């Protein structure tokens, strides 16, 4: 009796299933709600910018420093309240990409596909924004991790670039062999390299197949 290998499919989130950058929107929201933290963030920006230039856009600690600056000095209860407020705002303002979400649904309806949603946005935000969708409980989620530290929130893992490859390898082993991958960003090229079928999502939510 023939055995059929399961198809492993990767989806990015920001710019792929929806238009906006969830984590970037969250940081801007925090500063709008807590303008005094901008006094801390402003002198950190040159350090963050130089570090991203040297380390690359996928580096963890520069963005962790930015998150810390946006959240420093506030209790966990206050930050959780702000996060809940942001989630409500984001759900009201997010622009979904129906064509990409239709592809996701098609894979979920098949019996031979394992779906991995791998995103640079923090896991608590992703789970809170999409808690009531039929697809979130049925995908395997890998996302950036945040925790309390040094009087604010910090990133303990930033799931971007080559880190996406490393995280997926920890879950399913090596060598990676993916059937298909969907992303808007060149940052995901390291993971798309392992995909048999590669799809680029345009800023308008259209799909272009890559060679």
From Swiss-Prot:
Gene3D superfamilies: HAD superfamily/HAD-like (3.40.50.1000), SG protein - dephosphorylation function (1.20.1440.100). Keywords: Cell inner membrane, Cell membrane, Hydrolase, Lipid degradation, Lipid metabolism, Magnesium, Membrane, Metal-binding, Phospholipid degradation, Phospholipid metabolism, Transmembrane, Transmembrane helix. The keyword Transmembrane helix applies. Residues 55-211 are periplasmic. It comes from the Bacteria. This is Phosphatidylglycerophosphatase C. It is a single-pass membrane protein. Disulfide bonds: none annotated. Pfam families: HAD. The chain crosses the membrane at residues 34-54. One of its GO terms (cellular component) is plasma membrane. Residues 1-33 are cytoplasmic. It comes from Escherichia coli (strain K12). It is an enzyme of class 3 (hydrolase). NCBIfam families: YfhB_g-proteo.
């Amino acid at each position: 009796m023939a055995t059929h290998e399961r198809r492993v499919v990767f989806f990015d989130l920001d710019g792929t299933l929806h238009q906006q950058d969830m984590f970037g929107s969250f940081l801007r929201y925090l500063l709008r709600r807590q303008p005094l933290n901008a006094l801390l963030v402003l002198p950190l920006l040159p350090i963050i910018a130089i570090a991203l230039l040297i380390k690359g856009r996928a580096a963890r600690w520069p963005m962790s420093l930015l998150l810390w600056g946006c959240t420093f000095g506030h209790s966990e209860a206050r930050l959780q309240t702000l996060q809940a407020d942001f989630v409500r705002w984001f759900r009201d303002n997010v622009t979904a990409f129906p064509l990409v979400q239709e592809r996701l649904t098609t894979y979920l309806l098949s019996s031979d596909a394992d779906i991995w949603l791998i995103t640079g946005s923090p896991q608590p935000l992703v789970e809170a924004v999409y808690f009531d969708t039929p697809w979130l409980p049925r995908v395997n989620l890998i996302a950036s991790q945040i925790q309390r530290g040094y009087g604010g929130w910090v990133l303990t893992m930033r799931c971007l670039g080559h880190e996406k490859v490393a995280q997926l390898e920890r879950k399913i082993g090596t060598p990676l062999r993916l059937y298909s991958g969907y992303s808007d960003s060149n940052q995901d090229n390291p993971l798309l390299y392992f995909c048999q079928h590669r799809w680029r999502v345009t800023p308008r939510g259209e799909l272009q197949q890559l060679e």
